[in-house]
From Swiss-Prot:
It catalyses: uroporphyrinogen III + 2 S-adenosyl-L-methionine = precorrin-2 + 2 S-adenosyl-L-homocysteine + H(+); precorrin-2 + NAD(+) = sirohydrochlorin + NADH + 2 H(+); siroheme + 2 H(+) = sirohydrochlorin + Fe(2+). This is Siroheme synthase. Keywords: Cobalamin biosynthesis, Lyase, Methyltransferase, Multifunctional enzyme, NAD, Oxidoreductase, Phosphoprotein, Porphyrin biosynthesis, S-adenosyl-L-methionine, Transferase. NCBIfam families: cobA_cysG_Cterm, cysG_Nterm, PRK06136.1, PRK10637.1. The keyword Iron-sulfur does not apply. NAD(+) binds at E22, I23, P43, E44. Its EC number is 2.1.1.107, 1.3.1.76, 4.99.1.4. The modification Phosphoserine is found at S128. GO terms for biological process: cobalamin biosynthetic process; methylation; siroheme biosynthetic process. The active site is at D248, K270. The lineage of its organism: Bacteria, Pseudomonadati, Pseudomonadota, Gammaproteobacteria, Pseudomonadales.
Length: 464
């Protein structure tokens, strides 16, 4: 290990920055964020850096560098494009045994700046020892996506009770076990879900020795339209800590594979006129599993609150006092339209968009057809494949032109995506000609014409 990772408390200490340009500004921002007082030395200092110095309560010295500028400073930064000057600053600092960093010159440094993930008070530093800074930044970028910002709040919660826990458990092993339970259990879940007050209440109860609640928690997670890359970070995190996953037919296998490997998987999918598991039974199953103390992911295609019956499920959970979280997903209308190259709204073609269920009941649909034929709007029908002849017929009968552009998006956002475009008049015919199957989204409106020049994703299938 060439460099020993340390965290330096600079609050209120003076730091010398030699240089007044963009490089010096970048370093000075980090230093100022740590609460240091800046001393910047350069013949010219750019405006943003000047403001930063003033905000830190520091000083600007408008001249060339002098060895006496190091007086009273605990850290030295050489941030100029003058290599001999940078080398001189490094030598002077070393002679005084003051830590020095020379930008982009590891050989002249006694300290280097890592790539930083800031979730204060939790801070993560990644360094390549100056050998591959781009690689360190790429690793930092991955960590930024893996570690929610709420981890900082979780660390802050622990900090507020640290001394109290230390007094309760004088043995370090006991304290470690206590905090591991906190960070891996329901208290952390509440804090990460944005329920800080409840997390604090539970931590106080745990410190007081009260038995923890036996109830688990349910995560209602939107799996999006099919492409795993469209999952949210929170969805992925909760999927990977679930004990049980209840999933429906619209959840792609590639998404299901991202769940925790040893989680129990329960299929509760539904097909038209064939409910594998009645909705009421799904609701009861969620309650029963949570009462067993399990973390349950209810994984639903698209967004759980858009034609997903998510509202019914959490009503049941709320009635039984079961804690739950709702993680939105990209709904099929947004995802499939984007991957098909069809903007749902457009200044020249559509000023509004409607999401509509096309599900037939007793062979018909009970929809406000007169409203649906208004101009300058896009219609998106979910579950509309079986009822498509009725939908097209009713729209034309109520005044929508038979030549209105329309599209079918089958298995949108996946490698098996197929898109077929036509008009209201021939859309049902396209279904038969190309053997189109669910899940298929129906998009109706002038915006469909834009696909000819905006299509960008074709998947593995030909489109028409």
């Amino acid at each position: 290990m060439e460099f020993l990772p340390l965290f330096h408390n600079l609050r209120g200490s003076r730091v010398l920055v030699v240089g007044g340009g963009e490089i010096a500004l970048r370093k000075s921002r980090l230093i100022a964020d740590a609460g240091a007082v800046l001393r910047v030395v350069a013949p010219e200092i750019e405006a943003q850096l000047s403001e930063l110095v003033v905000q830190s309560g520091g000083e600007m010295i408008l001249r060339g560098y002098s060895e006496c500028d190091l007086d009273g400073c605990v850290l030295i930064i050489a941030a100029t494009d003058d290599e001999p000057l940078n080398a001189q600053v490094s030598r002077d600092a070393r002679l005084r045994c003051v830590p020095v960093n020379v930008v982009d010159a590891p050989a002249l440094c006694t300290v280097i700046f890592p790539a930083i993930v800031d979730r204060s008070p939790l801070v993560i530093a990644v360094s390549s020892g100056g050998d591959a800074p781009v690689l360190a930044r790429l690793i930092r970028a991955k960590l930024e996506t893996w570690i929610p910002s709420s981890y900082g709040q979780l660390a802050g919660l622990a900090a507020r009770f640290r001394n109290q826990v230390k007094g309760l458990f004088p043995n370090v092993q006991q304290r470690r076990a206590f905090w591991e339970e906190v960070f891996q259990g329901a208290i952390a879940d509440r804090q990460l879900a944005g329920q800080g007050a409840e997390a604090e209440r539970m931590l106080i109860a745990k410190i007081a020795g009260e038995p923890p609640p036996e109830t688990g928690e349910v995560y209602l997670v939107g799996a999006g339209p099919g492409d795993p890359d469209l999952l949210t970070f929170r969805a992925l995190r909760l999927m990977q800590q679930a004990d049980v996953v209840l999933y429906d037919r619209l959840v792609a296998p590639t998404i299901l594979d991202l769940c925790r490997r040893d989680a129990e998987r329960v299929y509760v999918g539904k097909r038209r006129a064939e409910h594998a598991v009645p909705q009421e039974q799904i609701n009861q199953q969620l309650v029963a599993l949570a009462k067993q103390g399990k973390r349950v992911v209810r994984l639903k295609g698209g967004d759980p609150f858009i034609f997903g019956r998510g509202g019914e499920e959490i009503e049941e959970l709320a009635a039984h006092g079961i804690p739950f979280q709702v993680v939105p997903g990209i709904t099929a209308a947004s995802g499939c339209a984007a991957y098909a190259g069809i903007p749902l709204t457009h200044r020249d073609h559509a000023q509004s968009v409607r999401f509509i269920t096309g599900h037939l009941k007793n062979g018909t649909t009970d929809l406000p057809w007169s409203d649906l034929v208004a101009p300058a709007q896009t219609l998106v029908f979910y579950m509309g494949l079986i009822g498509l002849p009725v939908i097209c017929e009713q729209l034309i009968r109520h005044g929508r032109s038979a030549d209105t552009p329309a599209a079918l998006v089958e298995q949108g956002t996946t490698v098996n995506q197929r898109v077929f475009t036509g008009t209201l008049a021939n859309l049902p015919q396209l279904v038969a000609e190309h053997d189109v199957h669910a899940p298929t989204l129906v998009i109706i409106g002038e915006v469909v014409k834009l696909r000819e020049k905006l299509a960008w994703f074709e998947g593995a299938q030909a489109t028409l």
